[in-house]
């Protein structure tokens, strides 16, 4: 698995009713739920890493600030960029932006760390 500093990926999602805080139980408003935003940011980190038949990455740490609400129907772009590689630990700078009034508005930012693991060895820990 080859991952390099500065490598990045962006995933684009549209907020659905099922993505709201009300729907996922993280609040009582029909706006993008923080757990969904976190999942989308993690998806961007996974897009950077990819995987092989023998290796993949798993999330180990998340520190994200959810800065602004987003309505159902909003288009959200989530970007992850490799900021640090320390042995098998890969740290990403992440951010989420929403197109609003012809501007890209920052709605979330933070840091996510993933560990490179051997698939079989990791899954053996379930036994």
Question: Predicted regions: what is each one?
Answer:
Residues 7-9, 58-62, 74-78, 88-90, ...:
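A generic structural signal for short beta-strands and their flanking turns/coil linkers
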Residues 28-36, 71, 102:
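Residues at secondary-structure transition points
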Residues 45-77:
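Hydrophobic beta-strand-centered segment that forms part of the acyl-chain substrate-binding groove
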Residues 71-72, 82-127:
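HotDog/MaoC-like acyl-thioester-processing domains
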């Amino acid at each position: 698995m080859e991952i390099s500093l500065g490598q990045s990926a962006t995933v684009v999602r549209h907020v659905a009713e099922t993505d709201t805080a009300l729907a996922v139980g993280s609040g009582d408003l029909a706006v993008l739920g923080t757990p969904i935003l976190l999942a989308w940011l993690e998806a961007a980190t996974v897009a950077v890493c990819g995987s092989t038949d023998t290796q993949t990455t798993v999330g180990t740490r998340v520190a994200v600030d959810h800065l602004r609400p987003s309505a159902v129907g909003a288009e959200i772009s989530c970007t992850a960029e490799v900021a640090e590689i320390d042995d098998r630990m890969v740290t990403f700078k992440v951010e989420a932006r929403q197109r609003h009034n012809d501007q890209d508005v920052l709605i979330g930012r933070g840091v996510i760390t993933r560990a490179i693991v051997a698939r079989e060895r990791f899954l053996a820990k379930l036994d």
